[in-house]
Amino acid sequence: MAEKAVTIRTRNFMTNRLLARKQFVIDVLHPGRANVSKAELKEKLARMYEVKDPNAIFCFKFRTHFGGGKSSGYGLIYDTVENAKKFEPKYRLIRNGLDTKIEKSRKQIKERKNRAKKIRGVKKTKAGDTKKK
């Protein structure tokens, strides 16, 4: 399939020094094309903002507008990958390949839940983590 023209616009651009990132809303115009992959978006954003490591770029919450041809979502560009690992939620790190998903069995989840039910208050988090001996 031939590459069709894709236009990327950013709006509400903001530099967040506290979280060491740039954050913005991305509008992608892709007429005659179903959608644009997040990998392609990361690549184009890295060129636009001269980012050395594309792993520090996160794109999420994309919605295609009715009728197609335009999508909107959010983008974050962290100063370093370490900052991204520090501030991003775990599920987003897993999606971007910076972390691995831990597969828990159904039985483990149920046992942890039942141990936590026996304890009240702040100690509940500790009860779910370890078994009593």
Swiss-Prot record:
**Sequence segments annotated as region (Disordered):** 104-133
Membrane-spanning intervals of the chain: none
* Stored Pfam families: Ribosomal_S24e
**Record GO terms (molecular function):** mRNA binding; structural constituent of ribosome
Gene3D superfamilies from the entry?
A: 3.30.70.3370
Keywords annotated in UniProt? Ribonucleoprotein, Ribosomal protein
Q: Where is the composition biased (Basic residues)?
A: 109-125
Name its GO BP terms in alphabetical order: translation
Can you quote a single GO CC term? plant-type cell wall
Say which family it is in: Belongs to the eukaryotic ribosomal protein eS24 family.
Q: Which PANTHER family match?
A: 40S RIBOSOMAL PROTEIN S24
Give the protein's recorded name.
Small ribosomal subunit protein eS24y
